[in-house]
């Protein structure tokens, strides 16, 4: 009963499995799936690279994301330059690294 249930689940989840074709070399790892159900053998040791079908990018389609949103080393969604004072005590000062919105050793960092 359990085996029937497992087979049914497998068939429901993986309905379009393609069986591999064993080549003359005896290796099942040397095959190329052209489309489901069709397997084309490659020469021993050959690797076929997939075709690249990329269209050239037209204009700047990427949106700039904010580098930071809050923190003592963040101003208007941009990181403050390295060396900018982010926290000062009577004994010492702490400076932004230019790579993080958090101040090193800032008490609000936890």
Swiss-Prot record:
What else is on record for this protein?
A: Negative results: does not show inhibitory activity toward alpha-IIb/beta-3 (ITGA2B/ITGB3), alpha-V/beta-3 (ITGAV/ITGB3), alpha-2/beta-1 (ITGA2/ITGB1), alpha-5/beta-1 (ITGA5/ITGB1), alpha-4/beta-1 (ITGA4/ITGB1), alpha-6/beta-1 (ITGA6/ITGB1), and alpha-9/beta-1 (ITGA9/ITGB1).
How does it get modified post-translation? Answer: Two conformers are found, they may differ by their disulfide bond connectivities. Conformer 2 is 33 times less active than conformer 1. Conformer 2 may represent a non-native protein.
Q: What's the superkingdom here?
A: Eukaryota
This protein's species is Protobothrops jerdonii
Spell out the molecular function terms from Gene Ontology: toxin activity
Residue interval(s) of motif Cell attachment site: 88-90
Compartments, record wording: Secreted
Which residues are removed as the propeptide when the protein matures? 21-67
What's the name of the protein?
Disintegrin jerdostatin
Which parts of the sequence belong to the Disintegrin domain?
A: 27-110
Subunit info?
Monomer.
Q: How is expression of this protein distributed across tissues?
A: Expressed by the venom gland.
Q: Does the keyword Membrane apply?
A: no
Q: Name the GO cellular-component terms.
A: extracellular region
